[in-house]
């Protein structure tokens, strides 16, 4: 689940977001080679399957996985003192079979939103907001650092779980600053990166999700 986070440090250009009012931080508009403008594609396993499509009221980013793992990443500079809330819209239409982030062998999700606070060599911190197939809503856990990335400090929050809301557009709101304080026992400064990820390689199954805007608000 966490491998793709490390690539954020290589992306060029930082998008600074400083505003007193509500700001649409990250949207999805056509770019090169099918990747939305301003984002960078990172492939972990298999072939990526993504497209910008018309869905309901407007454009959406569609991600599909077939025993694959890939992410879209973007560097930003977001002041959490001014805009501590993240608001996003997502829809899951297919969940990886038996997916459960609590076990390495089944750690697959159709929709994952990462906010990255630091990717310095010796200090990598992030929170992942996920839609899990099995783990109950509200579950939180710190993911053990893999041997290749001993300085990664990743916490997971299950925002949605299972089939009950499948096929529905849902708007989520999280107080990122508050979540950080609870999970890291410290005060956050800013967000340096955002990542959307989908994977199903562990369960060798399939997953599909749709995304609209991601905003940070007062």
Language model features by range: what are they?
Residues 75-86, 163-166:
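Extracellular/lumenal carbohydrate-interaction signature centered on repeated Trp-anchored short motifs
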Residues 89-95, 118, 177-179:
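Solvent-exposed strand-to-loop "edge" motifs in beta-rich extracellular domains
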């Amino acid at each position: 689940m966490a491998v793709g986070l490390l690539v954020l440090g290589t992306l060029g250009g930082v998008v600074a977001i400083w505003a007193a009012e509500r700001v649409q931080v990250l949207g999805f508009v056509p770019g090169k080679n099918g990747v939305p403008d301003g984002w960078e594609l990172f492939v972990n396993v298999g072939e990526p399957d993504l497209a910008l499509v018309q869905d309901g009221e407007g454009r959406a980013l569609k991600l599909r996985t077939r025993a694959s793992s890939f992410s879209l990443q973007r560097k930003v500079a977001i002041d959490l003192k001014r805009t501590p809330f993240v608001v996003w819209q997502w829809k899951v239409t297919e969940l990886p079979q038996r997916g459960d982030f609590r076990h390495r062998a089944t750690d697959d999700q159709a929709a994952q939103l990462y906010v990255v606070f630091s990717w310095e060599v010796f200090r990598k911190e992030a929170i992942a907001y996920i839609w899990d197939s099995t783990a109950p809503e509200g579950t939180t856990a710190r993911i053990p650092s893999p041997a290749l990335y001993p300085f990664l400090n990743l916490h997971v929050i299950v925002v949605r779980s299972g089939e009950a809301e499948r096929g529905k557009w849902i708007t989520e709101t999280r107080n990122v600053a508050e979540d950080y304080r609870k999970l890291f026992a410290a005060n956050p400064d800013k967000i340096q990166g955002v990542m959307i990820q989908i994977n199903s390689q562990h369960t060798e199954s399939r997953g599909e999700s749709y995304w609209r805007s991601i905003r940070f608000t007062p």
